[in-house]
């Protein structure tokens, strides 16, 4: 069970948190689509929460854990598995979790990294539905 708290500006796992007088629990999740680039107007017209972080920090695993749906977001031990902006519908379209490609140590060429930087930058600055970004940090590394 996962919940989102606006008051604490954080996502907590396995802890009921108040949201607008009630509790927000992820009951179901579904992969919707992927974008290789972002254009203003892309998305589904509902609130989006992006998941960002370095390559292989566990962004896709985090989405799977929140949704309690192993395999919803594809994972790999190889950095750079997520190459597109992936949209996942939560609670029958109540909101979207958006899995972003990682930054930093992906085992891809410089041209591919530049494409990702442009895609992520466009999404973060132009999405009209983006309400927050969860940045994952692996505390095991400096």
Task: State each model region's role.
Residues 13, 19-105:
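Conserved G1/Walker A P-loop phosphate-binding module
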Residues 8-9:
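Cationic, low-complexity basic patches in intrinsically disordered or flexible, solvent-exposed regions
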Residues 71-72, 77, 111, 116-118:
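Alpha-helix boundary/interfacial micro-motifs
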């Amino acid at each position: 069970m996962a919940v989102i708290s606006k008051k604490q500006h954080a996502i907590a796992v396995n802890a009921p948190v108040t949201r607008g007088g009630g509790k927000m629990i992820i009951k179901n999740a579904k992969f919707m689509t992927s974008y290789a680039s972002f254009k203003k107007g892309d998305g589904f017209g509902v609130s989006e929460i992006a998941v960002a972080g370095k390559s292989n920090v566990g962004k896709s695993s985090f989405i799977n854990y929140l949704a309690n749906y192993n395999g919803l977001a594809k994972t790999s031990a190889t950095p750079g598995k997520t190459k597109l902006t992936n949209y996942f519908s939560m609670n029958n379209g109540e909101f979207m979790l958006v899995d972003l490609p990682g930054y930093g140590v992906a085992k891809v060429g410089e041209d591919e990294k530049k494409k990702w930087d442009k895609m992520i930058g466009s999404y973060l600055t132009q999405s009209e539905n983006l309400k927050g970004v969860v940045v994952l940090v692996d505390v095991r590394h400096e």
